[in-house]
């Protein structure tokens, strides 16, 4: 029956039920591109032109305009089952039939005009697009299209003038010209022209012009004044631009409306340093914190002052409205994480705009006080260990009324051996608890008004973990740390841990572990009871977000130091640095210096091809009170983000290759790490990409 059905469908014509005068579109022949431009703007232009001209036919392969499956099942069903109005045949039609893609639906004339407009948007004013229709010689009701794109030479910007603005507005625009997105010699590009309108609007709004918008700016272009493919540009205000657009406004009274838990309107208020706070029954946020988040004078940058120098000499620039400050305040309220929503309103003192003052009103509602999260996972390891894990986290938001959050996390995992031999049955487990208190600011040391200029957090953390390795040992680890994270620039992130203390306790070692210890003393030293008092600093650089950065860089470096301050205290009391086995609370403490770095570079060859390279390395040097680095601080390689052909801890160090056993991974750590990856990434078709890599 199945074979008979296929034969029946194959016998159906795909053009049997086409409307009168219609032609079935069967795809495109490869596009012809003449005088292709190799500039980056030209690549973007061609990508958009290709997207505008692309139309997938029936039975297309992955949405391709040129490649199709050999069997048009959807069309066969459309033509074979169109006659059914009910029953099983109608169900088949509704589920599997494909409506024919008609040439009139593709409408190549409209697509041709759209493609020409796209070429002009990117400076190819003399570019052209044409197409040909190829009728199928076997069926005159089927046809393909082939487009020809002739890009020709692009036009370039000659000069850009500002005309038709007030003297003050023109002066502001001239002061900001050095940051212009369009300049002499660059290729004409509508995207950059739109970006320039937004930039100038932002510049004006940063010096008080609250009502200015990018839509109030337009361009006039002249290609006749300067020959040989150059455009003279004039940026002018649109006809009918309201006068209030160029008027500077200052900020007046500031007020906050904090809604109740159920959305109740405020029923009480208070004043704090000129900030009026309206609340329901009881203030949910400390007044001093609201003042810090909304302090209009705190969000200030030097560049803004330089750009506006000499513009308004009779009044303080700090009282002017600034889009930059508004954005920073909104980002600050969002980053605190305690508000369900927060809306800023700027209200003029009078509707006729006689007054130049805007009052600021913030309406906010707090989020839920508690969050809970439950995670499950199942792990399968190459040493025949399998088992489930779970973690449960409860977070209390806005603990002290200043955006702080406190969380408690419980985690556990259980593993058993999956080998066939019951005599080797081995069960391991791990249990842990941790608690963290996170402040959305730098708590100590205070960093002055710069604290308002960038995101910053302070984290206090305590934890305890019990790990059981059946037949070998139990390891108890507990400790805590204080970490400061802040990002002064979009490309730079700093993390400072001035205090990190870990205490490892080796418990219940078995005879099997004693045997292993005799064979590998370094392993025992790395696992024995010891304190790890450490300090750590991490710097991360990432310029992927920088506009126009074609080949981004990501670089992270971490420096950690352990035991040096403790050893210095002992030195004060007479014990030399070189003395070994000094104890802290009855246990030796680790002393080492650790450096770890990771550098990544992405080279974009063109829009479809790129090369990604990575080199990473690290070294840990033990000295003073330590012979061997703690096991938790040693390096290992392998896994999805490392040497991808090997699982974690299953390769090295160096050429070392231990005997195969379920515990061989314990040895495969080292004091020095150097690894590199290079990967060629390419586009196969549309959103389908491939890569070839070497680790």
Indicate residue ranges for each PLM-predicted region.
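C-terminal motif of bacterial Sec signal peptides marking the signal peptidase cleavage site
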Residues: 8-11
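Sec-dependent signal peptide recognition
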Residues: 1-3
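Acidic/polar loop patches that form or flank catalytic/metal-binding clefts of enzymes
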Residues: 213, 341-344, 405-406, 492-494, ...
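Amphipathic hydrophobic-ligand
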Residues: 124-129, 210-215, 386-390, 431-433, ...
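Interaction-mediating elements
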Residues: 13-335, 340-344, 357
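Generic beta-strand/beta-sheet core signal
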Residues: 236-238, 257-259, 282-288, 336, ...
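Gram-negative/organellar outer-membrane beta-barrel architecture
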Residues: 169-172, 305, 314, 319-556, ...
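C-terminal outer-membrane beta-barrel translocator/porin domains of Gram-negative envelope proteins
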Residues: 270-280, 377-383, 495-683, 692-693
């Amino acid at each position: 029956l199945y074979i008979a059905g296929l034969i029946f469908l194959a016998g159906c014509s795909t053009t049997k039920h086409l409307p009168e005068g219609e032609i079935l579109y069967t795809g495109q022949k490869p596009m012809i591109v003449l005088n292709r431009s190799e500039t980056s703007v030209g690549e973007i232009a061609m990508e958009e032109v290709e997207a505008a001209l692309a139309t997938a036919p029936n039975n297309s392969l992955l949405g391709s305009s040129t490649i199709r499956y050999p069997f048009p099942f959807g069309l066969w069903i459309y033509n074979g089952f169109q006659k059914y109005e009910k029953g099983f045949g109608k169900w088949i039609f509704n589920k599997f039939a494909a409506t024919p893609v008609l040439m009139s639906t593709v409408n190549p004339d409209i697509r041709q005009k759209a493609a020409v407009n796209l070429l002009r948007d990117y400076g190819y004013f003399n570019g052209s697009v044409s197409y040909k229709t190829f009728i199928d010689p076997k069926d005159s009701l089927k046809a393909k299209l082939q487009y020809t794109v002739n890009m020709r030479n692009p036009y370039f910007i000659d000069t850009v003038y500002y005309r038709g603005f007030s003297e003050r507005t023109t002066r502001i625009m001239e002061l900001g010209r050095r940051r212009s997105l369009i300049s002499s010699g660059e290729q004409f590009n509508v995207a950059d022209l739109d970006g320039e309108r937004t930039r100038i609007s932002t510049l004006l709004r940063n010096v008080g012009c609250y009502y200015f918008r990018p839509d109030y700016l337009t361009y006039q272009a002249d290609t006749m004044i300067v020959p040989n493919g150059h455009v003279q540009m004039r940026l002018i205000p649109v006809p009918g631009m309201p006068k209030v657009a160029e008027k500077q406004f200052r900020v007046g009274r500031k007020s906050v409306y904090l809604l109740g838990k159920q959305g109740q309107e405020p029923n009480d208020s208070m004043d704090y340093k000129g900030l009026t706070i309206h609340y329901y029954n009881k203030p949910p946020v400390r007044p001093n914190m609201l003042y810090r988040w909304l302090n209009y004078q705190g969000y200030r940058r030097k560049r803004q002052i330089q750009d506006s120098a000499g513009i308004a000499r009779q009044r303080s620039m700090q009282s002017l409205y600034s889009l930059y400050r508004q954005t920073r305040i909104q980002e600050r309220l969002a980053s605190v994480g305690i508000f369900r929503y927060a809306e800023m309103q700027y209200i003029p003192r009078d509707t006729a705009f006689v007054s130049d003052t805007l009052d600021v009103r913030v309406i906010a509602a707090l989020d839920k006080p508690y969050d809970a999260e439950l995670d499950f996972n199942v792990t399968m390891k190459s040493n025949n260990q399998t088992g489930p894990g779970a973690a449960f986290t409860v977070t209390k938001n806005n603990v002290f009324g200043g955006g702080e959050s406190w969380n408690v996390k419980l985690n556990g995992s259980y593993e058993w051996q999956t080998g066939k031999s019951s005599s080797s049955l081995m069960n391991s487990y791990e249990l842990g608890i941790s608690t963290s208190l996170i402040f959305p600011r730098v708590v100590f040391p205070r960093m002055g008004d710069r604290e308002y200029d960038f995101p910053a957090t302070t984290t206090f953390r305590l934890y305890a973990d019990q790990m059981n390795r059946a037949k070998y040992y139990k390891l108890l680890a507990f400790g805590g740390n204080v970490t400061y994270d802040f990002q002064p620039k979009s490309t730079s992130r700093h993390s400072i841990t001035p205090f990190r203390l870990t205490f490892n306790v080796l418990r219940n070692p078995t005879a099997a572990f004693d045997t292993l210890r005799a064979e590998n003393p370094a392993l025992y030293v790395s696992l024995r009871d010891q304190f790890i008092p450490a300090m750590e600093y991490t710097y991360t650089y990432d310029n992927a977000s920088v506009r126009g950065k074609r080949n981004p860089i990501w670089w992270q470096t971490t420096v950690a130091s352990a035991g040096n301050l403790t050893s210095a205290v002992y030195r004060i009391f007479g014990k030399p640095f070189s003395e070994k086995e000094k104890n802290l609370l009855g246990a030796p403490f680790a002393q080492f210096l650790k450096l770890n770095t990771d550098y990544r570079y992405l080279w974009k060859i063109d829009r479809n091809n790129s090369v990604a390279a990575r080199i990473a390395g690290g070294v840990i040097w033990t000295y003073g009170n330590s012979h061997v680095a703690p096991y938790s601080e040693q390096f290992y390689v392998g896994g999805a983000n490392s040497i991808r052909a090997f699982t974690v801890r299953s390769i090295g160090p160096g050429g070392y290759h231990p005997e195969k056993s379920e515990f061989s991974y314990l040895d495969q750590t080292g004091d020095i790490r150097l690894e590199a990856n290079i990967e060629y990434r390419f586009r196969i078709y549309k959103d389908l990409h491939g890569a070839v890599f070497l680790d």
